[in-house]
């Protein structure tokens, strides 16, 4: 801080990404946003009323429990919860489920429909509990651009008409 003559602080990488998005990117000027990274794990940053959410720990949204897809018999890889979002939808979870790295499965629609089911379920939980103006998705798994329309459709399906807002059109 002394060397740079600017305020300095430490936080998680995903909170840094979220701050970048609300300062300069996809959520510029928003007061309530969530950034989720899905890659080797699942991390999340939450901005609520213009402040990063901190409590006893940083938000562990990657460890929210998931209801398994009716056609998915995979038990999950999380050593603590097995079927949490990270255990079901992270890159290592996909590799354990299919025996191949996620980026080699791009042409198999069922893989991405299942992935969208879990991510969509998590987003519904986040929408209903935190009410963000925007949710930003990042991380290696999200490089599969076919996921975005599948996730959007899954969120609408799982919300089942409960919420109707313009923000849901721009998840």
Language-model regions, residue ranges each:
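Phosphate-binding/catalytic loop of phosphoryl-transfer enzymes
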Residues: 1-79
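ATP-binding/phosphotransfer module of carbohydrate and carboxylate kinases, centering on a glycine-rich
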Residues: 2-6, 20-30, 68-171
């Amino acid at each position: 801080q002394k060397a740079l003559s600017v305020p300095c602080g430490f936080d998680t990488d995903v909170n840094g990404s979220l701050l970048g998005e609300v300062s300069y990117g996809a959520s510029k000027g928003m007061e309530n946003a969530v950034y989720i990274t899905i890659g080797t794990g699942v991390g999340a940053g939450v901005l609520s009323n213009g402040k990063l959410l901190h409590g006893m720990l940083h938000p562990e949204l990657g460890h929210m429990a998931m209801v398994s897809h009716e056609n998915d018999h995979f038990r999950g890889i999380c050593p603590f919860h097995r079927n949490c979002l990270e255990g079901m939808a992270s890159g290592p979870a996909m590799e354990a489920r299919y025996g191949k790295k996620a980026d080699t499965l791009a042409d198999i629609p069922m893989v991405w429909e299942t992935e969208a089911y879990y991510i969509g379920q998590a987003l519904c939980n986040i929408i209903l509990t935190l009410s963000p103006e925007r949710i930003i998705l990042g991380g290696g798994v999200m490089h599969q651009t076919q996921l975005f329309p599948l996730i959007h459709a899954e969120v609408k399906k799982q919300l089942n008409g409960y919420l109707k807002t313009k923000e849901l059109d721009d998840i």
